[in-house]
Amino acid sequence: MKFIDEARIEVIAGDGGDGSASMRREKFVPFGGPDGGDGGRGGSVYAIADRNINTLIDYRYAKKHLARNGENGRGSDCYGKGGDDVTLRMPVGTIISDMDTGELIADLTEHDQRVMLAQGGAGGLGNLHFKSSTNRAPRQKTDGKPGERRMLKLELKVLADVGLLGMPNAGKSTFISSVSNAKPKIADYPFTTLAPNLGVVRVGPSKSFVIADIPGLIEGAAEGAGLGHQFLRHLQRTGVLLHLVDLAPFDESVDPVAEATAIVGELRKYDEALYEKPRWLVLNKLDMVPEDEREARVADFLDRFGWDGPVFEISALTGQGCEALCYAIYDYLSEHSDAHRAAEAEDLAADVRFRDAPPAKGGATPGDDA
């Protein structure tokens, strides 16, 4: 199935039914009075998170979603039937926002989470409600209210604990297939990965974490070059980033330090918050480096790269060093998961506050250019 992580849709809730202006007419009841029923409410449109769905492809082509209108009221105090609701099932991790106002409507982070996207209109009142001591035969009634109509942007950010960064052909797909149940396409040419892959890494009974592999980045990605920039958003929810570096490139003219520096630069240009995330350096393809040269090559790389954070040396192909890396990741996530969730909740709250901020004097809104 094609991976789609962004879509735009229109949701239209049903209109409420009109109230009825009817009089009771029965034999032997000369003053029957009003008996007009209310109109039914319009159907609403809901979104529900479903962990069994992993793409927004259904909404790339089905762009309009309508709920039914409520039925009109009738005589004999008959109320109109309410319109049927419409439920849209979306992947866990979907962010829903209003394209016209910029309002953040929902962030679907849990399975079966249900959110109203457009509310159906209220039904109109029948003339039964307008009867009084001075108006025994009212002819008044009210029409149903129109349902909400919204243009929405759907944006999927996969929920992963760990994100993989690196140039094309750095060995990210080989690594995720080596340590998890993911089966990405693997080949000896760049840009093999064209869409994010998720894998569950198990380090023991009831001990696991989710890792995300996105297409490789290239220099200029923040400005749109290559494929990886389209999927960097999927790393924004992760707790730690693994920066994979090919320590033994086939092309001897390629400098691993220059490539690693370019990746860090693109990360910073795309999102400062993403750049500030905990990041570990993973030096891959050690099996391609002669044993007597490994220590010197690693030391030279770290010295020229100027890295003083966590470093792991692995071979994704042979599995060397992968087990120790996975245990270190799990221990780190276990220790920092509460802080990570709190920070993510604060970021979401700040986003909501920003979007709901009142317009500034002169009609300008937050984020407008001066």
UniProtKB/Swiss-Prot annotation:
Subcellular location: Cytoplasm
Enzyme Commission identifier(s): 3.6.5.-
Known cofactor(s): Mg(2+)
A molecular function (GO) term: magnesium ion binding
Biological processes annotated in GO: ribosome biogenesis
Record: residues binding GTP: 166-173, 191-195, 213-216, 284-287, 315-317
SUPFAM superfamilies: Obg GTP-binding protein N-terminal domain, P-loop containing nucleoside triphosphate hydrolases
Cystine bridges: none
InterPro entries assigned to the protein according to its UniProt record, in alphabetical order: G_OBG, GTP-bd, GTP-bd_Obg/CgtA, GTP1-OBG_CS, GTP1_OBG_dom, GTP1_OBG_dom_sf, OBG_GTPase, P-loop_NTPase
Sequence positions that bind Mg(2+): 173, 193
OBG-type G domain mapped to chain residues: 160-334
Keywords from the UniProt entry: Cytoplasm, GTP-binding, Hydrolase, Magnesium, Metal-binding, Nucleotide-binding
Keyword Metal-binding among UniProt keywords: yes
Subunit structure: Monomer.
Assigned protein family: Belongs to the TRAFAC class OBG-HflX-like GTPase superfamily. OBG GTPase family.
HAMAP family: GTPase_Obg (MF_01454)
Protein name: GTPase Obg
Species classification: Bacteria, Pseudomonadati, Pseudomonadota, Betaproteobacteria, Burkholderiales
